[in-house]
């Protein structure tokens, strides 16, 4: 399925604290699908950065509402962890894993909800990734899979591509280490 849509930032913005949370109405979500032909909302649900001290789950109640509204509008909802302007970094792997342990079970039965492991977890392009970065992707994938075995998982959210084989190298590594691509994809 080709995904097309809009993004929402509930992680506090870039930098953290610069952007207020916006909750779209049911009517606006319905319009995205019916009038504009979109099928997806991409949500930076919470942020992993040095300036963001909010605990995992601080947006859960609002996310529950958005999950319901997206379902009613026949929209996919991609949930991810933002960077708060510290793009290309993992500030706290503990935060990321706790995020998926919290939200994975919460939405695992919602077939319109997809999980993006972490938005822009490494600097620059796919060519700058090293095996440790791929190991981090595996750890996130395994944590999500333990909590939500059937939810679509989006991996390898690059900022850009520098050489043609970069993604293939990462996909080969992840495949060798157990990613099941029948229910996972490159973001």
Range-by-range predicted roles:
Residues 1-40, 53:
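N-terminal carbohydrate-binding accessory modules
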Residues 5, 45-47, 185:
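Conserved beta-strand scaffold positions in the cores of enzyme catalytic domains, especially
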Residues 7, 12, 83-87, 119-121, ...:
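Short, flexible active-site-adjacent loop segments at beta-strand->alpha-helix junctions, enriched
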Residues 11-13, 46-50, 160:
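Short active-site-proximal "capping" loops at secondary-structure junctions
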Residues 21, 97-101, 105, 110-114, ...:
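Extracellular glycoside hydrolase catalytic/binding regions
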Residues 24-25, 62, 136:
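Residue-level preference for nonpolar/small residues embedded in alpha-helices
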Residues 29-107, 111-123:
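Substrate-binding cleft and catalytic face of glycoside hydrolase catalytic domains
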């Amino acid at each position: 399925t080709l995904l097309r849509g809009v993004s929402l930032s509930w992680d506090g913005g870039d930098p953290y604290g610069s952007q207020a949370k916006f909750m779209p109405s049911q009517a606006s979500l319905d319009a995205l699908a019916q009038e504009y032909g979109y099928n997806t909302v991409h949500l930076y649900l919470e942020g992993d950065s040095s300036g963001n001290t909010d605990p995992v789950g601080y947006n859960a109640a609002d996310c529950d509402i958005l999950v319901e509204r997206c379902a009613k509008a026949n929209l996919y909802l991609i949930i991810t962890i933002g960077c708060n302007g510290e793009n290309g970094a993992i500030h706290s792997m503990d935060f990321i894993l706790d995020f998926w342990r919290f939200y994975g079970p919460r939405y695992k039965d919602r077939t319109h909800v997809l999980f993006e492991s972490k938005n822009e977890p490494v600097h620059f392009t796919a060519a700058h990734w090293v095996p440790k970065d791929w190991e981090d992707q595996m750890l996130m994938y395994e944590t999500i899979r333990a909590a939500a075995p059937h939810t679509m998982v989006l991996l390898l959210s690059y900022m850009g591509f520098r050489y043609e084989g970069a993604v293939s190298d990462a996909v080969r590594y992840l495949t060798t280490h157990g990613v099941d691509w029948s229910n996972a994809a490159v973001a």
